[in-house]
Amino acid sequence: MDLLTRIKGPRDLDRLSLGELDQLAQEIRTFLVDAVSKTGGHLGPNLGVVELTIALHRVFESPRDKVLWDTGHQSYVHKLLTGRQDFSRLKSKGGLSGYPSRAESDHDVIENSHASGVLGWADGMAKANEVLRKDDHVVAVIGDGALTGGMAWEALNNIAAAKDRPLVIVVNDNERSYAPTIGGLANHLATLRTTDGYERFLARGKDILERTPVVGRPLYETLHGAKKGLKDFIAPQGMFEDLGLKYVGPIDGHDIEALESALQRAKRFRGPVIVHCLTEKGRGYTPALEDEADRFHAVGKIHPDTGLPISTSGLDWTSVFGEEMVKLGEEREDIVAITAAMLQPVGLGKFEAAFPDRIYDVGIAEQHGAASAAGLATGGLHPVFAVYATFLNRAFDQVLMDVALHKCGVTFVLDRAGITGTDGASHNGMWDMSILQCVPTLRIAAPRDADQVRAQLREAVAVDDAPTVVRFSKGAVGPAVKAVGRAGGMDILRRPTAARPDVLIVSVGALAPMCLEIADLLDAQGISSTVVDPRWVKPVDEALAPLAERHRVVVTVEDNSRAGGVGSAVAQSLRDAGVDVPLRDFGIPPVFLDHASRGEVMAEIGLTAPDIARQVTGLVAKLDGRFESRAVEPARD
């Protein structure tokens, strides 16, 4: 690591020869495998952009020039070259973020970890440079599947309209996002191979060459192997130049000298220009290259030599969903699945293997996925759209106007709901229950354990006249939490010890074990409580109001924003029913949460059993008249 440790900032790269740059690239790959294997993170994408990142920082002068990263999980090499080489606590509290972070460095312009948005940013920043007469360069790096998102093409449409506004767009073409990239864009890069004229040319050439003695067949095989290079050279150029964009490439994304030459040409061009780079996701790391599913897109802690996980965490929420989907697919031919370029991460790999003709990967295009789901439902099928909770935010209009308005039977399965922790602000699924509360007819299920995931998924797909949502957490699923009774459609998890109990605890989803712990802590203080799991948190069960009326205080506990969440819905429901019982809602405050473990984040925001029990004890004491108010002392001079 002799060269890497000498890099304190991008300008240190200027002193290195091409041979030293190649050595630096190797050192960076070795560093990444070693560091990320200890912490987990996005390994494959970063192994693929080493030379590209080196070239970018040699040609452009960050932070004066703005280098913007779409799907910021590709920014590890960028961090290393801008003075951030302590990866020992990557994605952990107090350590480096797994994405660009303004708090870390002036070299990080946008904290972007949702795909396809960077070209909009770049368009705006280039316009600002024009208005303010600044000669800074704006460089947007997009790829790893992000060009399957509609936002990128909306931005390109605007960018292409200004022929004399400088903007460099680097397309990192690794043919993959989380998995092999799908859709028309990927197919376009293969268009030349399947055109009639091209095939006739190949057939004629093959016939002539195979009749040529000695050298004919070997020469044909050599030329046949060049098809991909010819195809990649011609097809993308036509696509981008038809939009009115200058095109440079394709460039070998692992040839630093070629990359620098192309980027220098783009830098001098006084208008929008595409630099098309061909890279290999997972480059230099055999376990990643052998992983056909996703090239080690994101990994947990692994053995660096083998790439095998160091430990397994047991049954996880995603796997429970995936296995139940296969069973539902076997029972019902109308069940189909949708994923937005995340087949394996959302647990649909086994469903695809069992029913390859009943799964649709729409690319990084959640809006289209939701609208397509409405069409599938209208056509007589029941689509299950599995997506990370944070990414459904992008499709709100389609959920509202395409699915709900048309009473379509579509089930949205929200993985990574609640606090996800180490991926930081952009990946916490903490807004879905607030955003979706206002959607008419939509129903939301929040299962508390594996059994409830299975049961409530089945209940959801049985609804054919309205959208349903099933949300669950990230990671390992805990032991079953058994109900001791029922109230309407709700499960009673704990009965009170007193005839007139003090507190009704409304437990949402995976927080059931914590709510039972809260009840134990309250019981130790002589406070009797009931714990109820609504199961379906929208709409609020009609049986909740009479149950609440038999208690002195209602407490809601959810892993969602308090603003407009389940607590707000329960409060409104009680008001509508004329139940005048004090309610205290516990959840996530309306702030962006920094990266840390789930437990650390929950402790920081006070969403723990001891914190909640302490506050509820104080509330009950106040109702009892045991609260001692303290007079505010006057300020002293």
Curated annotation (Swiss-Prot):
Highest rank taxon of the organism: Bacteria
Record keywords, A-Z: Isoprene biosynthesis, Magnesium, Metal-binding, Thiamine biosynthesis, Thiamine pyrophosphate, Transferase
Free-text remark on how the cofactor is bound: Binds 1 Mg(2+) ion per subunit. Binds 1 thiamine pyrophosphate per subunit.
Record-listed thiamine diphosphate binding positions: H73, S113, H114, A115, G145, A146, N174, Y285, E366
GO cellular component annotations of the record: cytosol
GO terms, molecular function: 1-deoxy-D-xylulose-5-phosphate synthase activity; magnesium ion binding; thiamine pyrophosphate binding
Entry's EC annotation: 2.2.1.7
Residues binding Mg(2+): D144, N174
SUPFAM superfamilies documented for this protein: Thiamin diphosphate-binding fold (THDP-binding), TK C-terminal domain-like
GO biological process, one term: 1-deoxy-D-xylulose 5-phosphate biosynthetic process
UniProt xrefs under SMART domains: Transket_pyr
InterPro entries: Dxylulose-5-P_synthase (IPR005477), THDP-binding (IPR029061), Transketo_C/PFOR_II (IPR009014), Transketolase-like_Pyr-bd (IPR005475), Transketolase_BS (IPR020826), Transketolase_C (IPR033248), Transketolase_CS (IPR049557)
Pfam families: DXP_synthase_N (PF13292), Transket_pyr (PF02779), Transketolase_C (PF02780)
Known pathway: Metabolic intermediate biosynthesis; 1-deoxy-D-xylulose 5-phosphate biosynthesis; 1-deoxy-D-xylulose 5-phosphate from D-glyceraldehyde 3-phosphate and pyruvate: step 1/1
Cofactors: Mg(2+); thiamine diphosphate
Catalysed transformations (reactions): D-glyceraldehyde 3-phosphate + pyruvate + H(+) = 1-deoxy-D-xylulose 5-phosphate + CO2
Entries under HAMAP family matching the protein: DXP_synth (MF_00315)
Its biological purpose: Catalyzes the acyloin condensation reaction between C atoms 2 and 3 of pyruvate and glyceraldehyde 3-phosphate to yield 1-deoxy-D-xylulose-5-phosphate (DXP).
Family membership: Belongs to the transketolase family. DXPS subfamily.
NCBIfam families: dxs, PRK05444.2-2
Assembly notes: Homodimer.
Protein name: 1-deoxy-D-xylulose-5-phosphate synthase
